């Protein structure tokens, strides 16, 4: 199930095993192109048609009534509501630390320069539905939008064949202060909010994970709206020393592998003994898991155990992968943290399991995948705000610098640019 590789001897084979290049099939691309075109040109009629085709229900009201949301909240287990509220408080508290302030400063000559930070007006949070429900995705997407000050936060999630939305998702929406909830899923939902219809508002940003059709739709509508990222399958890397607990490592690898057969889980360690113990433990425990077949397939196709010559080499391999989640099961994780650059989130020590970050700790669980942690960041308040430059040039400073600026424009061959300055100089 898990193959052991030795680094650097087996580097080529390891890279082949862990190749996470995203390739969307052409049939899916054509399907999404058709959906986007029809929704853009036909509006609600196309959205309803695709919902009937893909979700098996003819909707007459795409928006979930407030009464249905309130009923789901009232019927929920009070203990679960308390957990949701505490988790949302943790997530919100973390994201408050990301909030940016506008700034202004004065230069010589009475010039004032600055940057104004303003929230987006409307956001859509896409929350996956289907066989699994993820109220945690509601909280994680809503908290930074709320902290940013977004005026209207809409959420959409697929309904079942009877038109019902998972009550736990509705309860989470109530806790998170969502403005409006829609019972739509798939590429047609993304298109509806990206372009707007007679009944669905056009938003400024679409965030949240989904299947390949949702991912393709988000990629296609980027430019009409902002997006957070293109989410891929879940992934975790565990760096561990000889003193790590094998069962902790295995369960953390299983926690990613149970999501999807395409999920990836990798152990990197300088200890050959630990590598053997983890492989044996994984083989023994996989059959005891409810999603054992999915776990086995994921670890066989996309998992690995990597034995390195040193902890420094282990960090090098992790940076090569640039994982979504990185766990450090080592005696002093803070000691090796400076050697690590590329990861969506880093979990420090054996008690900081990735599940804590998924639900409760506070940092966002919407993270870059497929190696994009090299250049992308977790979902944050910054995704829901805009930065506007402020320039207040003074009369005296234009008199001092105007001709220099005009000559700069002359060198670029832009006459009107230069004259826009010179005409003002004549009035000084």
UniProtKB/Swiss-Prot annotation:
CDD domains with a match to the protein in the record: Histidinol_dh
Residues at the catalytic site: 324 (proton acceptor), 325 (proton acceptor)
MF terms in GO: histidinol dehydrogenase activity; NAD binding; zinc ion binding
Enzyme nomenclature, EC number: 1.1.1.23
Superkingdom, natural source: Bacteria
Residues involved in substrate binding: 234, 256, 259, 325, 358, 412, 417
Pathway: Amino-acid biosynthesis; L-histidine biosynthesis; L-histidine from 5-phospho-alpha-D-ribose 1-diphosphate: step 9/9
InterPro entries assigned to the protein according to its UniProt record, in alphabetical order: Ald_DH/histidinol_DH (IPR016161), Histidinol_DH_CS (IPR001692), Histidinol_DH_monofunct (IPR022695), Hstdl_DH (IPR012131)
CC cofactor: Zn(2+)
Pfam family, one: Histidinol_dh
Ligand binding (Zn(2+)): 256, 259, 358, 417
Reaction(s) catalysed (UniProt annotation): L-histidinol + 2 NAD(+) + H2O = L-histidine + 2 NADH + 3 H(+)
Keywords from the UniProt entry: Amino-acid biosynthesis, Histidine biosynthesis, Metal-binding, NAD, Oxidoreductase, Zinc
Coiled-coil ranges (or none): none
Biological process, per Gene Ontology: L-histidine biosynthetic process
A cellular component term, taken from the record's GO annotations: cytosol
Chain residues that bind NAD(+): 126, 188, 211
Cofactor remark: Binds 1 zinc ion per subunit.
Its biological purpose: Catalyzes the sequential NAD-dependent oxidations of L-histidinol to L-histidinaldehyde and then to L-histidine.
Family note: Belongs to the histidinol dehydrogenase family.
Name of the molecule in the record: Histidinol dehydrogenase
Native organism: Chlorobaculum tepidum (strain ATCC 49652 / DSM 12025 / NBRC 103806 / TLS)
